[in-house]
Amino acid sequence: MKIGFVCAEYFGFKSIEGKLIPTSTHGGFGFLTKVKAEWLANEGHDVHVFTYAASYNYENNTAEELNENGVTIHLIPEKERVGKSSFSSGIKQLSKLKGNDFFREVLTEQNLQILQFEDTPTTLLLAEVNTIPKILIFQDPFDYYDVNLLVDSQNNYSSLIEGHNEQYVIKREDYKFSSEIAINYLHKKNFVSPIRKLLIPSNNITIFAEADFIGEKVKNLFKLASTPITVRNPIQIYDKTEEKTHKPSFVWVARWDAQKRPDTMLEIASQIPEYDFYLIGTATVSSKDNTSIQTKLETYFSRYPNIHILGFVQEEEKRKYIGKAWALINTSIREGLPITFLEAMAEGTPIISYTDPDRYVSNFGIRVDYSIKSYISAIYKVVEQKLYEKLAGKEREFIMREHEVNTIMNKHLDIYKKILNGETD
């Protein structure tokens, strides 16, 4: 079967002068696409991924083609990119999706049997003239509430934390954002309306959601007749988990931006010097504002010896940090169902989080209020109760049943076959 994936990011690399260089931007969707694509390729399918080249290592106006672990990766030049990481640049470029002939030509010349979209539904516009069957798995769509929440957070990046020190406070003007952009993003022609028009049977699109609550959100946002079926995301589950550190340690894995709130994590860690905190992730390359804020935060919090800012790390190394930690801490103001939650559960690591998608946190960790005090209380509770010992078995059992990669990907294959045989709506 010849299968294509469209994702704005992909967790791939290429060797340049002996150094391993990222081929695209990185994030949960990119990693997820990699897991799916490589599993299918390993099963003998012809798999193609269409993504954007990282701007700092690719400048030519032609698509570059790589092969990694059996997957053909088509890298589209950054100058053709639309829907960049920041809302403002993404909105300005969104109207150009229909005219992105370069991307469409690369996409359609492969004669794919199935084309699957893994991230923002705006990418669906790239294939509106494509007649092949398409699958859209809604991972993390923003509804009106989400956008308003993000506007508030981006306009007050540091003001939501309690008791912050004026020496490192990030001024409001360091992070510019227009609420008008957010309104246009959802209320006008740029998002909801064009996507809604595409989600009709004649366009040969099958819709799924990665979590139950996302299915409900999608139904309401796009006024669908029924709620999309949930197809859980896959995760590799290893036979042996990492041994927890003797001294309590905690891990945070995310982008450095207003949604993920690294400042909150750093403030929490600074108030608990007796435990170690490891922060994995970085600001997106295309966002100078986020990069500047990250630098300010790193400079100030470098004085705390229990805070370890690791930046970007390879997947195997990330898994070890998550596995050894007494808990994964998530400080995001809103989320879909993060891949890091699944990775933590696969390692028997509890989750401390304000967001609670499909009650994963309530069932396998501690759901907190959004305050420094609440997070700190949860951290001490994890240590005092050795919560990982109580939850590890339940987490592993659940994740094996609901997210194990072979089970989920065989479900994908069944879906593909039914679509090609005309057996689904």
Sequence positions of predicted segments:
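Aromatic "clamp/platform" in nucleotide-sugar-dependent glycosyltransferases that forms part
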Residues: 333, 357
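Nucleotide-activated donor-binding/catalytic signature segment of Leloir-type glycosyltransferases, i.e.
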Residues: 291-313
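Membrane-proximal helix-turn-helix segments that form the acceptor-binding/catalytic region
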Residues: 36, 142, 157-207
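A charged, aromatic-enriched C-terminal amphipathic alpha-helix characteristic of glycosyltransferases
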Residues: 386-424
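Helix-loop-beta element that forms the nucleotide-linked donor phosphate-binding surface
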Residues: 198-209, 215-235
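Short hydrophobic beta-strand element within catalytic cores of glycosyltransferases
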Residues: 341, 350-353
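Conserved donor-binding/catalytic core segment of Leloir-type glycosyltransferases
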Residues: 208, 235, 242-260, 266-269, ...
